[in-house]
Amino acid sequence: MLGHNILTLGECDELDNHIVMCSTGLLSPQEDFSNVNAGHPNNEEAICSLCDKKIRDRFVSKVNGRCYHSSCLRCSTCKDELGATCFLREDSMYCRAHFYKKFGTKCSSCNEGIVPDHVVRKASNHVYHVECFQCFICKRSLETGEEFYLIADDARLVCKDDYEQARDKHCNELEGDGSNKRPRTTISAKSLETLKQAYQTSSKPARHVREQLASETGLDMRVVQVWFQNRRAKEKRLKKDAGRRWKSSNRAESDSNSPIESINGQSPNYLYLDHPMDDGNESNYLFHSREQTPDKYYRNETPSTDPPPMHMTTPSVLTTNFSTPLSLSTNVYNLPPPESQLIPHMTPQYI
């Protein structure tokens, strides 16, 4: 019988038994026996961990202490054979590209993972593939130095021209005779109860929660969003009214030497909400999004002056906020995989 060498995925870095990355090396049988606790392929105990068949190939692949046929060691996504390296997570093996696509940092537009050596675009805290960095209305790619607007809720991007057209059209509708205004929305008692229960859970629900509420109540997404905005504004107004009534009551009823902030020597007992009531905090950085036709997607929340647009500049580290032009990075943005470590000689440099 032919002699066998063992092709082993040797020392593996492991984190919480979830993710490991290994590299392969060709060892002689004697070297392999001194480093791993597994039988030689000539031995009856050499069994492939995937197909449960004896390994009689010239080379044997070892991953995390387990033996495999070289033909069985494949990426669970693309089914290609794994060569020099592989990634292991939850007993599934992946090639480098598909591991990062599935478990790496996600593109804010397509929600797919980004491979570390790919060039990316960055706006605020959001990262995009270069091909995904485009206006979601006209689908035109945004170039370096171009002004654009960022929607806070879902990280969508809008070029300056489309935003200004939508804003101007909306302003013209508001200045009209009112004949084109939408009818007032009526919410049924059952739908109202559903919205109230959701409000008790969170006064500022995430987008996917609003989508679920819209599906359950049969209301438009925009209607659900406006209902939550109005509810927060109402509670804020009630809170201010309660404060004014407290001061008035204090002046009328307190005849003791207690402080102004108390009545009959006792501190006021207010119930404060544990979340900010200012609706301005929950608006988009530059505008609100609408769920109707594209030309109604935005409404300028500042009646006096328009907020300054964000700018894409030459590649640089983002240091601006939303009151100043937003920079755009075209640097190679290496993103490490979540909960993973690499062996020292395979460690990429992360920026």
Curated annotation (Swiss-Prot):
SMART domains: HOX, LIM. Signal peptide: none annotated. Interacts (via LIM zinc-binding domains 1 and 2) with lim-7 (via LID domain). May interact with itself. May interact with homeobox protein ceh-63. Residues 238-254 have a biased composition (Basic and acidic residues). PROSITE patterns: HOMEOBOX_1, HOMEOBOX_2, LIM_DOMAIN_1, LIM_DOMAIN_2. Residues 46-105, 105-169 form the LIM zinc-binding domain. Disruption phenotype: RNAi-mediated knockdown causes severe defects in the ALA neuron in young adults. RNAi-mediated knockdown abolishes expression of helix-loop-helix protein mbr-1 in the interneuron DVC. Residues 180-239 bind DNA. InterPro entries: HD, Homeobox_CS, Homeodomain-like_sf, Lhx3/4-like_LIM2, LIM_Homeobox_TF, Znf_LIM. This is LIM/homeobox protein ceh-14. Residues 255-268 have a biased composition (Polar residues). Expressed in the anterior AFDL/R sensory neurons and BDUL/R and ALA interneurons, and in PVT, PVQL/R, DVC, PVNL/R, PVWL/R, PVR, PHCL/R, PHAL/R and PHBL/R cells in the tail region. It comes from the Eukaryota. GO terms for cellular component: nucleus. It is found in: Nucleus. Probable transcription factor, modulating expression of helix-loop-helix protein mbr-1 and homeobox protein ceh-63, perhaps acting in concert with ceh-63. Binds to a motif including the sequence 5'-CTAAT-3' in regulatory promoter elements. Confers thermosensory function to neurons. Required for correct AFD-mediated thermotaxis. In concert with homeobox protein ttx-1, perhaps as components in a complex, specifies identity of AFD neurons, acting by synergistically regulating receptor-type guanylyl cyclase gcy-8, gcy-18 and other genes. Residues 238-268 are annotated as: Disordered. Keywords: Developmental protein, Differentiation, DNA-binding, Homeobox, LIM domain, Metal-binding, Neurogenesis, Nucleus, Repeat, Zinc.
